[in-house]
A protein has these predicted regions:
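Conserved active-site alpha-helix within GNAT-family acetyltransferase domains
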Residues: 35, 41-43, 192, 204, ...
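Gly/Pro/Ser/Thr-rich low-complexity, intrinsically disordered segments predominantly at protein N-termini
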Residues: 1-42
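Active-site rim helix/loop that mediates acceptor-substrate recognition in acyltransferases
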Residues: 97-136, 165
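Conserved beta-strand-loop-alpha-helix junction that forms the acyl-donor binding cleft
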Residues: 182-186, 212-222, 238-242
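Acyl-donor-binding surface of acyltransferase catalytic domains
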Residues: 35, 41-66, 238-241
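Conserved GNAT acetyl-CoA-binding A-motif
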Residues: 202-214
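A short beta-loop-alpha structural element at the N-terminal edge
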Residues: 67-94, 233
């Protein structure tokens, strides 16, 4: 998540109108020379899920209506369309046209498949399809980060090439890199169903936790994380004492 896909915006207006503008936490707002100037300022938080906890089945989309399937790089084109629709009103992609969002989606997904977000774990990445329509309605992609203190900013990127056998050895730290849902199928537990599907192979490989990242201002993502049992990772600079778990 970065400002790569967030355009700087300049809109001429009266200062009184500027004061009444709604704010988005992903942008910095300034009034300069008779115009509102919005500059990208995305900030992210990290959260962690204890994989020993069971995800309640009642929170998950019905297995009668939706089918989980493996996710493959050959699904990239369909995934890009789904991605673009899912993030239509969400930063850092909300300021793009539909064509630009599809392009951004394709680039982001290829980065993940190619390991730029850490080694991609195909065995823990899934699709969800509507049984009645056969339509793709959700996807989750998991990668592996360095095994480190999640409060340390360096824990979220590989400074050196990661070993190729991390997954086979149950090493590295799983990270929920992308999860997205069709706009017409939100609110029925699709994301939670995908999360439950991902948790199973992670547990089987001996992983105890799953990290995730969300952008400040994406309230629906934040609430989804809390509803599914994620806990906020404290900042390494925080002076608050850490809770012992």
């Amino acid at each position: 998540m970065c400002d790569e896909w967030m355009p700087k915006v300049r809109v001429p207006m009266a200062s009184e109108s500027f004061q009444r503008l709604p704010r988005n936490a992903a942008y910095n707002y300034e009034y300069l020379e008779g115009a509102a100037v919005l500059s990208p300022r995305p900030r992210t938080y990290h959260a962690i899920l204890d994989l020993t906890r069971t995800i309640p089945s009642e929170l998950q989309a019905s297995a009668v209506d939706y089918e989980v399937a493996p996710l493959m790089p050959t699904d990239a084109e369909a995934l890009a369309q789904l991605f673009a629709g899912a993030f239509e009103r969400t930063q850092p992609f909300a300021g793009l046209t539909i064509e630009e969002r599809i392009e951004a989606a394709a680039v982001c997904l290829q980065r993940t498949f190619q390991g730029h977000d850490g080694p991609w774990v195909a065995e823990a990445s899934f699709l969800l399809r509507s049984r009645s329509e056969g339509k793709l309605v959700g996807a989750i992609l998991v990668t592996l980060l360095p095994q480190s203190d999640p409060a340390d900013i360096s824990a979220y990127e590989w400074l050196d090439a990661p070993p190729s056998d991390l997954w086979m050895k149950g090493q590295g730290q799983p990270h929920l890199t992308w999860i997205f849902t069709h706009a017409w199928h939100k609110g029925v537990g699709i994301g939670t169903r995908l999360l439950a599907a991902t948790a199973t192979p992670l547990r089987e490989h001996g992983y105890a936790s799953l990290l995730s990242t969300f952008i400040v201002g994406n309230d629906s993502s934040q609430l989804w994380h809390w509803r599914n049992g994620f806990e906020l990772v404290p900042s390494i600079t925080s002076k608050r004492p850490r809770l012992k778990t």
